Design a protein with these regions (language model features):
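A conserved acidic beta->alpha catalytic loop
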Residues: 36-47
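Glycine-rich, basic loop-to-helix element that forms the pyrophosphate-binding segment
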Residues: 63-80
Length: 283
């Protein structure tokens, strides 16, 4: 059963040189890597072109305009023929065999929807939260369940796209995963964890973010969206993000429809009470 993997590049030539080579080298002859380049950074383009002859480099698309994530993702989903669809970010180094493990789990467990690799650190794992949501399926595959997972190092059944369609312009991958969960698909991180090295985590041995100035120069999109403009703030966000993923409500209806609207209204009107309720709702 074949796998198609999206790899998006932008303006990080040093990261791309490491991450694209690693991704290509982790693939076998049943896997195809589709590279989409956003923008006109020539150094990054040169790095991408240097890998064009690799046997696992399947397709390349260059968008002069930065189309970010949704359009490249839909490009893969519309055109790729594989049984499984994945994505790896240019700031992530994948471990050997990662896609094979996830594919085997998908084949053995029909209800798995989006499953993936973990990129947080040991210090980010809170056993009293995580252990409650690690579930074994078919006697052999374990998953740390959540309604959504991150957008790098995942593998998704093609049937998910048949069920849900493409990413809509006003919705992100997190929302897509939640809606899949609402349809009965099971999402989460394979356990024991398959670790991908997130180089934009300042704790990574391969990070390019060693000072606050490095962070400002190469500000990750998530850091920008969360107002994390110093290494201290960025590390604090990453740790809290891992906590959220281990404690978030497992009922997808909590995030959708009328219940979600009521919850957002309640949080806006009664912020202190809402924070207390959130703590009590942790699973």
């Amino acid at each position: 059963m074949s796998i198609d993997i999206l790899f998006i590049t932008y303006n990080r030539p040093d990261y791309t040189k490491l991450s694209l080579k690693r991704l290509l080298d982790t693939c076998d002859d049943t896997m195809r890597v589709w590279v989409w380049h956003n923008g006109t950074d020539q150094k990054t383009l040169d790095v991408v072109q240097s890998f064009r002859d690799h046997p696992n480099f399947f397709e390349f698309y260059h968008s002069i305009e930065n189309k970010k994530l949704n359009e490249p993702t839909n490009w893969l989903w519309k055109n790729a023929p594989g049984d499984f669809l994945g994505k790896v970010d240019d700031d992530c180094l994948m471990p050997s065999g990662w896609a094979n493990v996830l594919r085997e789990a998908h084949v053995d467990v029909p209800q798995f929807g989006v499953i993936g690799c973990w990129h947080y650190f040991e210090e980010d794992i809170i056993p009293e939260y995580a252990n409650k949501r690690i579930v074994r399926y078919n006697g052999q595959h374990q998953l740390l369940q959540n309604c959504w997972i991150g957008g790098s190092g995942y593998l998704m059944k093609r049937q998910c796209v048949k069920d849900m369609g493409l990413l809509q312009a006003n919705r992100n991958f997190t929302n897509y995963c939640i809606r899949l969960a609402a349809k009965g698909w099971v999402n989460g991180w394979y356990y024991p964890f398959i670790y991908q090295d997130h180089m934009d985590d300042p704790r990574s041995p391969n990070t390019g973010l060693k000072t606050d100035e490095d962070l400002k120069k190469h500000l990750p999109l998530t850091a920008k969206n969360t107002g994390s403009y110093s290494l201290t703030d960025w590390l604090d966000f990453l740790h809290k993000d891992a906590l959220v993923l281990q404690s978030a409500n497992l009922d997808p209806k909590y995030y959708l429809g009328l219940r979600a609207k009521i919850r957002k209204f309640r949080e806006r009107i009664f912020p202190l009470k809402s924070s207390i309720i959130k703590e009590s709702e942790k699973i």
